[in-house]
């Protein structure tokens, strides 16, 4: 089976119509999660970088749109396209974090509410015992600027896999093919997959479009 569990559209600040995203996935994949950007609990840390202050309004405006009817539209369309046995859809949404790195909460239930948090660790606590995966992605960016911090990794059912590859590039290490192409910076060894493995962590690996 092939799918994409981290796929964006313009419901927040991705590109392309949401229905087009589902239609394209249905033509080629077995399952998908079209994933809104939903929150950034430590966004005020951007104030330490004057050149990045514009980013705050850009993101918070999108989060407001999601909470002013956007999430209900997203949830309804996710249910509409779910066709068990042929094509599965999943509710998922993304939280950014300067400290912890970006994560997606992927829900088994198609009735999942939008759950906020004060930090990624707080998010993980809220989802304990539920059928929710909390997975880090674009892990190779610089720690402190939305790259992953392996000291917060918890091995187990809640985070059975991490995202090694996406349109951002390859997070296997800080060298090698497909460098990071986004304006959030080059790859950083301490956030990479190989670094996590060298710490003795055990996890599965996935790739998504993001």
Placement of each model-derived feature along the sequence:
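Extended, charged catalytic domains and RNA/DNA-binding interfaces, predominantly
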Residues: 1-209
């Amino acid at each position: 089976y092939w799918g994409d569990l981290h796929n964006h559209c313009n419901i927040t600040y991705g590109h392309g119509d949401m229905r087009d995203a589902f239609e394209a996935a249905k033509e080629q994949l077995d399952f998908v999660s079209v994933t809104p950007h939903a929150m950034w609990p430590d966004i005020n840390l951007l104030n330490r970088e004057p050149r990045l202050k514009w980013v705050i309004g850009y993101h918070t405006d999108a989060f407001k749109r999601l909470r002013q009817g956007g999430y209900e539209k997203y949830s309804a369309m996710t249910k509409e396209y779910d066709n068990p046995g042929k094509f599965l859809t999943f509710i998922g949404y993304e939280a950014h974090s300067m400290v912890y790195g970006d994560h997606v909460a992927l829900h088994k239930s198609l009735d999942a509410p939008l759950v906020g948090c004060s930090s990624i660790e707080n998010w993980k606590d809220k989802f304990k015992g539920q059928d929710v995966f909390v997975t880090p992605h674009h892990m190779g960016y610089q720690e402190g600027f939305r790259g992953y911090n392996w000291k917060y990794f918890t091995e187990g059912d809640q985070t059975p896999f991490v995202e090694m590859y996406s349109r951002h590039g390859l997070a296997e290490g800080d060298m090698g093919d497909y460098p990071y192409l986004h304006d959030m910076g080059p790859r950083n060894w301490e956030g990479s997959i190989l670094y996590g493995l060298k710490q003795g962590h055990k996890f599965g690996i996935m790739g998504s479009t993001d």
